[in-house]
Amino acid sequence: MALKELFDRDWQELESEGILFSNLEKLVAWGRSNSLWPATFGLACCAIEMMSSTNARNDMARFGSEVFRASPRQADVMIVAGRLSKKMAPVMRRVYDQMPDPKWVIAMGACASSGGMFNNYAIVQNVDSVVPVDIYVPGCPPRPEALIYAVMQLQKKVRGEAFDQLGHQLPMVDAWTR
């Protein structure tokens, strides 16, 4: 088929024959969203729930987050699970700075999102004051399904889609973004 004939045809007709039209940004965003490689920063009891999100029952690998990366240089998502002490904050910032761009952060649990239920002088009250957070997962500790939902919402954010079918941001009870 000549190139001129291809451009003269209707878009719907070409799509029905299996020819897809997109731009490079959308294709790269689709690839990034379906191959998020998380680096774990498990600090407390939320880390146990984070580990259970990869077991056979929950299987986070279905969504492209197959293996937790041991090195931040191989990861593009940091999952901060649990409380962050003020002594550990510079270490977490260093790990975040070692991640290649583009990078995203999920704050998992009440401690990572708001400092926890108890006001403690040694705990950072919001991880967002150390690194920029993209998705918050509330709960103490949140269930593995909540983390998987947050990963799915992060995939939508990476692709540049709306968060839900109604056009609203994420509900606060499940996960939310800033």
Curated annotation (Swiss-Prot):
Gene3D superfamilies, per the entry: 3.40.50.12280
A GO BP entry: aerobic respiration
Any one GO CC term of the record: plasma membrane
Catalytic activity: a quinone + NADH + 5 H(+)(in) = a quinol + NAD(+) + 4 H(+)(out)
Signal peptide segment: none
Molecular function in Gene Ontology: 4 iron, 4 sulfur cluster binding; iron ion binding; NADH dehydrogenase (ubiquinone) activity; NADH:ubiquinone reductase (non-electrogenic) activity; quinone binding
Chief location bin: membrane
Cofactor requirement: [4Fe-4S] cluster
Enzyme class: translocase
InterPro entries: NADH_UbQ_OxRdtase-like_20kDa (IPR006137), NADH_UQ_OxRdtase_20Kd_su (IPR006138)
EC number of the protein: 7.1.1.-
Ribosomal protein keyword on record: no
Localisation: Cell membrane
Role of this protein: NDH-1 shuttles electrons from NADH, via FMN and iron-sulfur (Fe-S) centers, to quinones in the respiratory chain. The immediate electron acceptor for the enzyme in this species is believed to be a menaquinone. Couples the redox reaction to proton translocation (for every two electrons transferred, four hydrogen ions are translocated across the cytoplasmic membrane), and thus conserves the redox energy in a proton gradient.
Similarity comment: family membership: Belongs to the complex I 20 kDa subunit family.
NCBIfam families on file: nuoB_fam, PRK06411.1
Record's protein name: NADH-quinone oxidoreductase subunit B
Origin species: Deinococcus deserti (strain DSM 17065 / CIP 109153 / LMG 22923 / VCD115)
Classification lineage: Bacteria, Thermotogati, Deinococcota, Deinococci, Deinococcales
